[in-house]
Amino acid sequence: MDWTGVRAMVFDMDGTLLNTEHAIVTAASQTLVQLGHAPLPAAYRMPNMFGTAADLMADVLKERQLPMPQAGKAQLGQWFEHHYAQQPPHGAPLYAGVRAWLQAARDQGLALAVCTNKQHALALKGLEAAGILDLFQVVTGRDSCGVAKPAPDPLLFTLGHLHVPPHAAVFFGDTHADAACAQAAGVRFAWFTAGFGTDLVRQYPRVLDFADYRGLPLPTVALA
């Protein structure tokens, strides 16, 4: 990867920085129980790991052949987020090497930010619990600008707050929603292949595929 001209690195959160799969499945199961349904079976795999909370839960209901509650999809997402907020911090660990690599990037003078479909308050809580919130200048949640990825708006919103143009940034993510967001925003995309994404990501342009931050070359850029 040639880091020339890169002034900012923006990261998706779930499946890119934090392995939140266990916490997400647990919160989804608790939401089903709240609705009067059976909990999810052990080792359940979420049918959707890249949308908003409401999207995730709607797809769980569909996969389990359960009806949408009368309160609607938006309320369903809020119930999920309530249960997710109760999960213990250790339920969403950092991927190996994340903190050291982020710190190295900061030491090179790069601006760092997070752009996630998680609610902003939950994103702040998760990053703080993981001990990396202090490394980011901007954290954008799905409620920060009124629209979620794969729309380009959240990423452009993030870069606007960093005062960095799209051509001078790289977006790190794990799903095709991240890749589509980057493409629409005119931002280079780096794919974390060990996250929650599928081969759908291969349909989008990428400057880097990597599975481990510990093997990722450290940025050594000279900023103009």
In which residue ranges do the predicted regions lie?
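N-terminal helical cap/lid subdomain that shapes the substrate entry/recognition surface
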Residues: D2-A100, R106-Q108, A121
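A generic structural signal for short
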Residues: L17, P89-H90, A111-L112, D143, ...
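Conserved catalytic-core motifs of eukaryotic protein kinase domains, centered on the activation segment
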Residues: H22, T116, K125
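Residue-level detector of anion-binding/catalytic polar loops
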Residues: A38, A111, R188
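Hydrophobic, well-structured mid-protein blocks that either form specific transmembrane helices
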Residues: P93-V98, A111-T116, I132
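Conserved SAM-binding loop
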Residues: L17, M46, L112-C115, V147, ...
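Asp-based, Mg2+/Mn2+-dependent phosphohydrolase catalytic module
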Residues: M1-M9, Q103-R106, Q119-H120, L124-A224
